[in-house]
A protein has these predicted regions:
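Helix-turn-helix repeat elements of alpha-solenoid scaffolds
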Residues: 36-51, 76-91, 119-133, 163-173, ...
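Structural motif corresponding to the intra-repeat A-B loop/turn of tetratricopeptide repeats
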Residues: 39, 78-79, 117, 162, ...
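DNA major-groove recognition helix of helix-turn-helix/homeodomain DNA-binding modules
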Residues: 1-14
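TPR repeat positional signature
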Residues: 29-32, 68, 107, 152, ...
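Residue register of alpha-helical TPR repeats
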Residues: 27, 66, 105, 143-150, ...
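Residue signature of alpha-solenoid helical repeat architecture, marking inter-repeat boundaries
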Residues: 23, 60-64, 101-103, 142-146, ...
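Amphipathic alpha-helical segments of tetratricopeptide repeats
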Residues: 49-56, 89-97, 128-139, 173-184, ...
Length: 241
């Protein structure tokens, strides 16, 4: 499962074009970890991380930094080592270029950590910086598009936590429209659920239900049983109101 693909050299264009990504010896690991992060499955993420760090493969700076980023996530969520995780991410940002994908990933994760520990001013400053950075990126590149969607979803979620429901719904709806324009379902179901939850107090009941139903259909198509179960519970609660 974890056998790495054939090693390829860095293309010369990489040094002149920031949109080109180095061929990585962590290709399989990155694919698996991305899926586990989307599912918030930190147990399995730690398992594959432990396997990966035992390998004696050549790693680029960006690959090594990617593993440091994953370790910070594991430390924060698995071991409650919040200060250490935050410090690790802050150090990552000091040593890699803001043009790289891993910089954007680390900055987004650090922003989330700031939010979770109550450092709201730092979170909001980072969010503004992330939006500025993504405005310079080509969203035809899937990694940039998905990263931008993640940042905006996280911000909508943050607004809900601050009980700024109107702003949260507006942010989520704009991001849903972006998903549809770009013809991607990435984070679309969670965004629809967020609109349903945030709008429960002032949207029409049928409107809320329709957002849940649309999210449910996406979960069926893409086989996401955990999220599907949550949606079914939301619909049951809605029917009892």
């Amino acid at each position: 499962l974890f056998k790495l693909s054939q090693r390829l050299e860095v293309p010369l264009d990489y040094f002149f074009n920031e949109q080109i990504e180095i061929k990585s010896n962590l290709s399989n690991f990155k694919q698996l970890s991305a899926r586990l992060l989307d599912d918030r499955n930190y147990d399995d993420l730690e398992y594959i991380y432990r396997i990966e760090i035992e390998r004696s493969t050549f790693l680029t700076l960006e690959d090594r930094t990617y593993l440091e980023w994953i370790k910070a996530i594991i430390d924060f969520y698995q071991y409650d080592s919040k200060c250490e995780a935050i410090s690790s991410l802050e150090n990552i940002l000091l040593k890699v270029s803001s043009n790289t994908l891993i910089y954007l990933k680390a900055l987004n994760t650090l922003s989330n950590f700031y939010s979770l520990v109550g450092r709201e001013q730092e979170y909001e400053a980072n969010y503004s910086h992330l939006i500025e950075l993504y405005q310079t990126k080509n969203l035809d590149h899937q990694e940039f598009l998905f990263g931008y969607i993640r940042v905006r979803y996280n911000y909508a979620h943050y607004l809900v936590s601050k009980e700024k429901y109107n702003e949260a719904i507006q942010e989520a709806l704009e991001t849903i429209e972006l998903c549809k324009q770009r013809q991607t379902s990435y984070q679309l179901a969670p965004l629809l659920i967020l609109v349903g939850n945030a709008g429960a107090k002032f949207l029409d009941r049928e409107q809320v239900k329709n957002y849940y139903i649309e999210a449910r259909e996406l979960c069926k198509i893409y086989n996401n049983p955990l999220m599907l179960m949550k949606i079914e519970n939301y619909l049951k609660e809605l029917d009892t109101v």
